Curated annotation (Swiss-Prot):
It comes from Arabidopsis thaliana. Belongs to the splicing factor SR family. Component of the spliceosome. Homo- and heterodimer. Interacts with RNU1, U2AF35A and SR45. This is Splicing factor U2af small subunit B. SMART domains: RRM_1 (SM00361), ZnF_C3H1 (SM00356). The gene is U2AF35B. Pfam families: RRM_1, zf-CCCH. Residues 191-283 are annotated as: Disordered. Necessary for the splicing of pre-mRNA. Probably active at the 3' splice sites. The keyword Coiled coil does not apply. One of its GO terms (cellular component) is spliceosomal complex.
């Protein structure tokens, strides 16, 4: 029974826990949902609810005055917001991903999901965001159960084939330019490469301990094989002193004799006849 409940946890078959809150961290029913919303007490992911206010909030592609908006200006507005939020959250620790929803439903519009590398960094950011405002609006932040965005995002939206539009219950992640992504997240790759080079130049204390243990194990194996507790370096010095030979107990080096040539049948018969004559003469 326990295995069955664990296998259906967070799925449509689970009649106790809300699958949408488990996968997306948001549910269109909110607190009125008939299923449980298990809010995590600690998580590497924070949800900043309805934080991004797009310039075409009322009608996509049109400003509040009813004038059409240039798509490039909408993208610039979004990337300015994205960079601003990233730089602020990056103060608390390494940010692995930052996703902003492009959905239009009330429970998902403008939602910002930030996944930190460490849970402690997320907790520090959550503490610092309490009571703060952005663009004149209070920041509503909380831990989110979402840690794998592959299960939360709409695959049809990524393929430009979602027929639910902005009211889809899965995340429509708004994309940033490649240049901005390289600028923001590339710093971690550069710092990692620098750290790798510095680590390659010097051996860490842990590696030193492992190296010394390996050398000790090698010495024990040498003593077991050769006795006298001699190390391989001592044997190599003796090997060089003796001229590289393999002499043992002072015995001279033997030279191999050439192989005996097998006798023919006529030679054997002649030798046997000679033995018989010598035997008869002796008698």
């Amino acid at each position: 029974m326990a295995e069955h409940l664990a296998s259906i946890f967070g799925t449509e078959k689970d009649r106790v826990n809300c699958p949408f809150y488990f996968k997306i961290g948001a549910c269109r029913h909110g607190d009125r949902c008939s299923r449980l919303h298990n809010r995590p007490t600690i998580s590497p992911t924070l949800l900043l609810s309805n934080m991004y206010q797009r310039p075409d909030m009322i009608t996509p592609g049109v400003d509040p005055q009813g004038q059409p908006l240039d798509p490039s200006k909408i993208q610039d507005h979004f990337e300015d917001f994205y960079e601003d939020i990233f730089e602020e959250l990056n103060k608390f620790g390494e940010v692995e991903s930052l996703n902003v929803c492009d959905n239009l439903a009330d429970h998902m519009i403008g939602n910002v999901y930030v996944l930190f590398k460490e849970e402690d960094h997320a907790a520090a950011a959550l503490q610092a965001l309490q009571g703060r405002f952005y663009s004149g609006r209070p920041i509503i932040a909380d831990f989110s159960p979402v840690t794998d965005f592959r299960e939360a995002t709409c695959r049809q939206y990524e393929e430009n084939s979602c027929n639910r539009g902005g009211y889809c219950n899965f995340m429509h992640v708004k994309q940033i330019s490649r240049e901005l992504r390289r600028k923001l997240f590339g710093r971690y790759r550069r710092s990692y490469r620098r750290g790798s080079r510095s680590r390659s130049r010097s051996i860490s204390p842990r590696r030193k301990r492992e190296h010394s243990r390996e050398r000790e194990r090698g010495d024990v194996r040498d003593r077991d094989r050769h006795g006298n507790g001699k190390r391989s370096s001592d044997r190599s010095e003796r090997h060089d002193r003796d001229g590289g030979g393999r002499r043992r107990h002072g015995s001279p080096k033997r030279s191999r004799s050439p192989r005996n040539v097998r006798e023919g049948s006529e030679e054997r018969r002649a030798r046997i006849e000679q033995w018989n004559r010598e035997r008869d003469e002796g008698v």
